[in-house]
Amino acid sequence: MALATGAKYYHSCINCGGINTDTRNEKGLPCEVCLPFEDGDVLKGLKLNNSLKGYEKYWNLNQQYKEFEEFFFSKINKKPTGYQRFWAKRLLLSKSFTLVAPTGVGKTTFGLISALWIAKKGGKVALVFPTVSLVEQAAKRLIEFSKEDEDVNILFYTSSLKKKEREKFEKNFSEGNYDILVISSQFISKRKEQLSQKVFDLVFVDDVDAVLKSSKNIDTLLNMIGISQKAIDSTLDNLKKGNNSDKIQIEEKAPKGRLIVSSATAKPKGIKPLLFRELLGFEIGRFTTSARNITNVRIKEKSLEKLLYIINLLKDGILLFVPTEEEGKEIANYLEEHGVKLGKTWEDFEKSFEKFKEGSLQLLCGIYSYYGKLVRGIDLPLRIKFAVFWGTPSFKFSTKLENAPRFILERNFQDYLENNPKLKAYFKDLQRLSTEKLRKSVEKYISPETWEKLIQKNFPTTKFDKEKNLIVIPDVYTYIQASGRTSRIFGTSLTKGISILFEEDDSLFELLKARLLYLTEEEWTEEGEIEHLVKEAEETRKAISTDSSSKDMKSRMIIVESPTKAQTISKFLEKSSTRRYGSLMVHESITQEGILLLTASKGHLYDLETKTGLHGVEINDGRFIPYYNSIKRCSSCGAQFTDELPRCPYCNSDKIDDKKKILEALRDIAMEVDEVIIATDPDVEGEKIGWDISQYIKPVNKNVQRIEMHEITKFGFDKAIRNRRNCDVNLVKSQIVRRIEDRWVGFELSLRLQKNFQNSNLSAGRVQSTVLGWILEKEIEHSKSKKTVTQFTLDNGFKFEVDGKIDVDEVEVEIVEEKEQALSPLPPFNTPSLLTAASQQFKLPVQQIMEILQTLFELGFITYHRTDSTRISSTGQKIARSYLEKIGKITLLSEREWGKEGAHEAIRPVKPISPEELSEFITEKIAAYLSPMHIKVYSLIFNRFMASQMTSPVVINQKILIKNGSFQVEREVPVKLQEEGWNIFNPITVYTPFEEKKYSVVSKRTYTTHTVPLFTQASLIEEMQKRNIGRPSTYAKIVDILFKRKYIIEDVYKRLRTTALGRKVYSYLSERYMNYINEETTRQLEKLMESVETGEKDYQSVLKNLYEELNEILIKN
């Protein structure tokens, strides 16, 4: 089977940038024009053909890297590590960047050898170190490395130089008699005028924190790589005004050299550090990582005796976190009295830290605040093994109106406004109100009784202390930061850590547990495991040898579809820096496996063009060759097109955003990394986007793989990475067939419609036209199905209907039987059933619901939302179990799979987090912001999923006969809940039991109805699934396009009706082209597409059949 489709892609030839086939791109070959033959050396072939162009850049990089690697090896007898390999490629591509990496991977070594490399090539280098001693050490190492490189002149300056040495330095420095200049951060500050006049090919800053202490140093560094002061001042001025720095002339901005800086330990402050982003395309990064290998243990008995027992069990390498200095002193005294050697952050900490570092102290004791000395300030991967918390770190907030913080005021007032529409219209944007004005408004409109109820309602997952008028919220970020000291990346290994929490309060512990699970997906274990865990922690540190950095690490680029998804992933991976590549933002993260660069393609990059062949498909010797061009979008009118045009074909604007720029940026990054992983959506469209990117990147990086993320969580990410694969070419071919069929039939039918109706907004397609026919047929059936009914309401509130116009004042009820019935749960949602339920419940258009689902998926709240499956995996079942355990309802668990193993699951929550908890997490800024409607849709999904994994509730049903002289009707009514089950999530309506007696009719209403209901958006999608027309990914789009073309409208009851235009269009199409828009033909075509997906049918033979069909349409013209 061919590993390519034979399609032709514009801009994809690695040499000329012209059209190339995906077949040749897969092989890493330029197009046939550049290289007519496939055999032999590519570079030689291009030279012989006199066609060498862009390929030379790629070839040069590979050659230069081989030379650099040999040079590197010659200096330290080791090849570059994965980190150093990645940095070297960036260096060779003349890029400026931040070195973001853990301790022990050779950042300084890389800087020194890079300096020698540049110097050997005739360039000038400045190396900047934070202290004089480090300058001397670096100079010494450089001299050692350069013994065989006699032509490299190394000049360094320290304050300890003797007078003659200083005079010699000054002469050589002023005259530029050096290849490598080694200086301190202080030298940068003092010699600004001189350094600003010099231009270096490379400036390497070993400790950027020291340089950033003075903002003037930033100007100096930028001057040193050839950026003019005018460009710096203009960029700074634009930053202050919020303007675009791209307006500055390119020649003024363009650096002549490269700037490489080490990562910062603290976030750079002020506006000046933003110059690096604006002028060099990178932000000063900090080494942060989400990589954690921590086991959490809760100990409920909170006594000093128990604490001492645990400390003696752990022995050494302990951080003890306490809530206050006062309590800390009491604990420290007790431990010292019992022989524990410890230091305290509030008492000669620097001395204690050094003693702890060298091993003469077992334990350091400090206060657990987010910026505490022990929480953030230390990094000793081999020394710190255990974190012990004396109580849960938490925030306490007053609930008294006069003292309540803003978030409580805002949350409660927002809720109050929901039930007061007029007031809500007045208070449109609470964000604009000052806190005091907000407080006064709350006091004015909300009574103390209502306020207390709102507190209880809106903060259900916090600990509420009614006596002290406080709510207590766990400080989960401090807990994560502090416990994270125990598990660090050192070199290329991740140490094991143990976090032990002493907490008596069950409710507070559960609150922390839920938040920790949401953010880190970590679980808790029992106290009995501690001894085993201690051994594990020791073993991971013993395994870390001094040459652990020799283990090869990979640099990888991961490409997702949307920036939102990229942002979500970067949060749980914890991005260390952000870099701009053209129009792409790239987040850089450090994981245990190496460096990850995360970016987004922003959807499809290629689509069929229209001009070549038959609507973008060339027919050559019986084969169909699609031509794909980059998607262009007009910035003025928003129109999309693919043809190579200098102006928008719709509004004539020359402001065109071409996705070719994204492709070029992705190829550029691919040259830097070891591997590329494509993580587009797990469906046919995602596969095609992945394929388009893959074939474009393959010429510069053959290591391209595909992953499917069915949930955007750390668990989903790790699982996907473990199951990497190649792109599925059958899925790609299936999408090609769908797109060509849509283009051929859709274009031809649309052109005929537009010509006949003189309306360029009209369109047609198999599925949309078939569905339009259903709506029209349903209207006809509906109009013929009128009947009269009377609705009665009895004096016990029960309602029922009877056919005909009937006028009675009382009825008699006879109880036929009473019986128990177990009510089975509904299956979890798939796309059609969820669209139906959400549309009915919230009265939203299905397209809007799909957008809400897309957001919930991309932000990591639900599984993939385009699915026909109702299957629940073992992971999903564990989520249900975990939540029921948390709320004390585990006896109601009844795990169900609901379907066979397949590519997708049902739509379900990805974590055991209730809608109420999620609302709390949003308020606490733990979770990304969601609108109230997003929460409602999530609640619908959560409740249906939980119900699907629970026991069936048992009800007592009464079968009753309601009769009168003119009618009798039978009804079955639940009158008692015998056993609870899934009803705790989806309540069951239970009626008051009937008695055998006469009931009065308290109201009656006679009206005309129809036995055949019109379609709603929800029922139409149900029908599409039932009749196998369309797919989960297209249901909502089909309905949406019928609205956009003004073929259908919704009446006041949200029912679908055809417009006069819709009826005329369908009449025209059905009279002339019924064979192409009838249901059976459309269904058979869906089956053909599926057979291409599975590899049963060759996509070329299917295209041939479609082409023959199209010819019939063309003949009918």
Swiss-Prot record:
Zinc finger (RG N-terminal-type): 3-42
Enzyme active site: Y864 (o-(5'-phospho-dna)-tyrosine intermediate)
Record-listed Zn(2+) 2 binding positions: C634, C637, C648, C651
Chain intervals annotated as zinc finger (RG C-terminal-type): 631-658
Stretches assigned to the Topo IA-type catalytic domain: 728-1114
Motif DEAD box: chain residues: 206-209
Molecular function in Gene Ontology: ATP binding; ATP hydrolysis activity; DNA binding; DNA topoisomerase type II (double strand cut, ATP-hydrolyzing) activity; reverse gyrase activity; zinc ion binding
SMART domains: DEXDc, TOP1Ac, TOP1Bc, TOPRIM
Tagged with keyword Zinc: yes
Thermal dependence, as annotated: Optimum temperature is 75 degrees Celsius for positive supercoiling. Optimum temperature is 60 degrees Celsius for ATPase. No supercoiling is seen below 50 degrees Celsius.
Cofactor binding, per record: Binds 2 zinc ions per subunit.
Ranges where the Helicase ATP-binding domain occurs: 88-284
Listed Pfam families: DEAD, Topoisom_bac, Toprim, zf_Rg
Domain of life: Bacteria
EC number assigned by the record: 5.6.2.-
Cofactor: Zn(2+); Mg(2+)
Primary localization class, coarse: cytoplasm
Subunit structure of this chain's protein: Monomer.
Comment field on protein domains: Introduction of positive supercoils requires the cooperation of both domains. The helicase-like domain probably does not directly unwind DNA, but more likely acts by driving ATP-dependent conformational changes within the whole enzyme. A beta hairpin in the 'latch' region of the N-terminal domain plays a regulatory role in the enzyme, repressing topoisomerase activity in the absence of ATP and preventing the enzyme from acting as an ATP-independent relaxing enzyme; it also helps to coordinate nucleotide hydrolysis by the ATPase domain with the supercoiling activity of the topoisomerase domain.
Function summary: Modifies the topological state of DNA by introducing positive supercoils in an ATP-dependent process, increasing the linking number in steps of +1; also positively supercoils with dATP and ATP-gamma-S. With UTP or dTTP relaxes negatively supercoiled DNA, in the absence of any nucleotide partially relaxes negative supercoils. In the absence of nucleotide has a higher affinity for dsDNA with a single-stranded tail than dsDNA or ssDNA. Has an ATPase activity in the absence of DNA.
Record's protein name: Reverse gyrase
Species per Swiss-Prot/TrEMBL record: Caldanaerobacter subterraneus subsp. tengcongensis (strain DSM 15242 / JCM 11007 / NBRC 100824 / MB4) (Thermoanaerobacter tengcongensis)
Lineage of the organism: Bacteria, Bacillati, Bacillota, Clostridia, Thermoanaerobacterales
